[in-house]
Swiss-Prot record:
Pathway: Cell wall biogenesis; peptidoglycan biosynthesis. Cell wall formation. Adds enolpyruvyl to UDP-N-acetylglucosamine. It catalyses: phosphoenolpyruvate + UDP-N-acetyl-alpha-D-glucosamine = UDP-N-acetyl-3-O-(1-carboxyvinyl)-alpha-D-glucosamine + phosphate. Its EC number is 2.5.1.7. Pfam families: EPSP_synthase. It is an enzyme of class 2 (transferase). This is UDP-N-acetylglucosamine 1-carboxyvinyltransferase. The lineage of its organism: Bacteria, Pseudomonadati, Pseudomonadota, Gammaproteobacteria, Enterobacterales. Belongs to the EPSP synthase family. MurA subfamily. It comes from Pectobacterium atrosepticum (strain SCRI 1043 / ATCC BAA-672). One of its GO terms (cellular component) is cytoplasm. The gene is murA.
Length: 420
């Protein structure tokens, strides 16, 4: 297993080009199964989860290749089962189920893996597909869905906001007979991006980005070319990198309008921020950040995927900040690792109280999930001495060449292969 060795402290400064959003590229790749003609998807990040998805689509019989863009031709899909050996590393595989049952009348997906943060049941996906008329059984570790003829449009009220289930229902409903309405739908930018992709292929989806999405079913979807939205979480991570190191940064190829809650908290922390249509600049003018208090909540609230990075910000800030995590359980696993580097914090159930310290010290730490691993790498950049971050396969699942981008900002970071 690779690890990162980081020598600090450094003040990070410079420019970074943001990659396409993993959380939009994944549902879009799975939604390409609905298309009867070839699709070209641009701005797809180079990540382990993307590679796994491309491999999975290939196993289902789609022709998939990458040459700059990702090209998917699902016209000859003839296998309707996503096997355990690919699904076990990535919970996003459940997104194959809706398109398979909607287009082919059958699909089965092994129960998924992914980050070890709390319970992420597939119940809401199953509930949604059942409302559309699919018969679903769970057996031998697989979710198996079938339907006679086409799925039927339905009025579906979600009892919990779920990005994953909203994507499943919206994708499947594009080929259903009649109209589907999803109430209490997730509002994330990645939902909007997936809807825009499907509409490019001929779907009739309106209301994405609000809590009520309407899908008028169509008989078939064709091909098209689509560009994935920039990654707001990668953008936020690099903005925090500059903030915690008292540095400055310009993020290019990004979408400031998807980051309102994060930018507001960075301004509160003392950052000088300017935005253009596709760029954000942040300058700390050499100052230490101020602690901030917030609760994570579904979009447009503060994103849970930025919570670990802001925990780090609070732990090196002036003052005390309180962070309450309302989305996932077990999402403070980075905090004990940061305490080993000299941070001061108490965890009380779903809240962490962060007491800012003036400096951290390098230590050997272990990544436990994707965003936690990013906060540990950033901690290494600002800590005095050497930090090694183990289990960085987590970070490769969600960040496109993070060490190259940090190095361009002045970080002293190297990837150490296991045999060295």
């Amino acid at each position: 297993m690779d690890k990162f060795r980081v020598q600090g402290p450094t003040r990070l400064a410079g420019e970074v080009t943001i990659s396409g959003a993993k959380n939009a590229a994944l549902p879009i790749l799975f939604a390409a199964l609905l298309a009867e003609e070839p699709v070209e998807i641009q701005n797809v990040p180079k990540l382990r989860d993307i590679d796994t998805t491309m491999k999975l689509l290939g196993q289902l019989g789609a022709r998939v290749e990458r040459n700059g863009s990702v090209h998917v031709d699902a016209s000859d899909v003839n296998v309707f089962c996503a096997p355990y050996d690919l699904v076990k590393t990535m919970r996003a595989s459940i997104w194959a189920l809706g398109p398979l049952v909607a287009r082919f009348g059958q699909g089965q997906v092994s129960l998924p893996g992914g980050c070890a943060i709390g319970a992420r049941p597939v119940d809401l996906h199953i509930y949604g597909l059942e409302q559309l008329g699919a018969q679903i059984v769970l057996e031998e570790g697989y979710v198996k869905a079938t339907v006679d003829g086409r799925l039927k449009g339905a009025h579906i009220v979600m009892d919990k906001v779920s990005v994953g289930a909203t994507v499943t229902i919206m994708s499947a409903a594009t080929l259903a007979e009649g109209t589907t309405i999803i109430e209490n739908a997730a509002r994330e930018p990645e939902i909007v991006d997936t809807a825009n992709f499907l509409n490019t292929l001929g779907a009739k989806i309106s209301g994405a980005g609000s809590d009520k999405i309407t899908i008028e079913g169509v008989a078939r979807l064709g091909g098209g070319v689509y560009r994935v939205v920039p990654d707001r979480i990668e953008t936020g991570t690099f903005l925090v990198a500059a903030a915690v190191s008292r540095g400055q940064i310009i993020c290019r190829n990004t979408r400031p309008d998807t980051l309102d809650a994060v930018l507001a908290k960075l301004r509160e922390a003392g950052a000088d921020i300017e935005v253009g249509e596709d760029w954000i600049s942040l300058d700390m003018h050499g100052k230490r950040p101020k602690a901030v208090t917030f609760r994570t909540s579904p979009h447009p609230g503060f994103p849970t995927d930025m919570q670990a990075q802001f925990s780090l910000l609070n732990l090196v800030a002036e003052g005390t900040g309180v962070i309450t995590e309302t989305i996932f359980e077990n999402r403070f696993m980075h905090v004990p690792e940061l305490i080993r580097m000299g941070a001061q914090a108490e965890i009380e159930s779903n809240t962490v109280i962060c007491h800012g310290v003036d400096k951290l010290s390098g230590a050997q730490v272990m990544a436990t999930d994707l965003r936690a691993s990013a906060s540990l790498v950033l901690a290494g950049c600002i800590a005095e001495g050497v930090t090694t971050v183990d289990r960085i396969y987590h970070i490769d699942r969600g960040y496109d060449r993070i060490e190259d981008k940090l190095r361009a900002l002045g970080a002293n970071i190297e990837r150490v292969k296991e045999h060295e």
